[in-house]
């Protein structure tokens, strides 16, 4: 499920995943096109729930960054855009946010932004997204997430 957004924004949600197979995940995705996108995942990786981010750029392979292990009970995910820059944050409580990734992605046209459930090695997974929230305002303190 996605929408097109132009300009600055912040999109956040609380995600839960049943996590049975490797890489089962709840994902917040930002996409310019098939060769230019980024995703922030609450993912079952290395036999535990983790925060994972991936950025793909034209002419290169995707990178994959396992950030840290988190509780299996669910996590808050957030993408914010300001100009050509994007930041990925996670939070345990939806109040205090931790920076996962900060990167530049050129895009003059509107970008696709939305939620994805993925289970690339399994038979599917149940993902629940709660409180999907949009704001036209970006986060102003990227490092602290405020």
For each predicted feature, which ranges?
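Extracellular glycan-recognition regions
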Residues: 1-146
């Amino acid at each position: 499920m996605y929408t097109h957004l132009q300009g600055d924004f912040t999109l956040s949600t609380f995600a839960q995943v049943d996590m049975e197979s490797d890489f089962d995940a709840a994902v917040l995705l930002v996409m310019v096109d098939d060769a230019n996108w980024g995703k922030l995942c609450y993912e079952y990786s290395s036999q535990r729930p983790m925060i994972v981010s991936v950025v793909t750029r034209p002419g290169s392979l995707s990178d994959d960054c396992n950030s840290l292990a988190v509780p299996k009970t669910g996590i808050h995910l957030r993408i914010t855009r300001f100009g050509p820059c994007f930041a990925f944050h996670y939070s345990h409580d939806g109040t205090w946010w931790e920076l996962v990734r900060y990167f530049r992605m050129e895009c003059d046209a509107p970008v696709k932004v939305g939620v994805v459930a993925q289970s690339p090695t399994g038979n599917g997974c149940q993902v629940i997204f709660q409180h999907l929230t949009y704001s036209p305002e970006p986060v102003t303190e990227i490092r602290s997430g405020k």
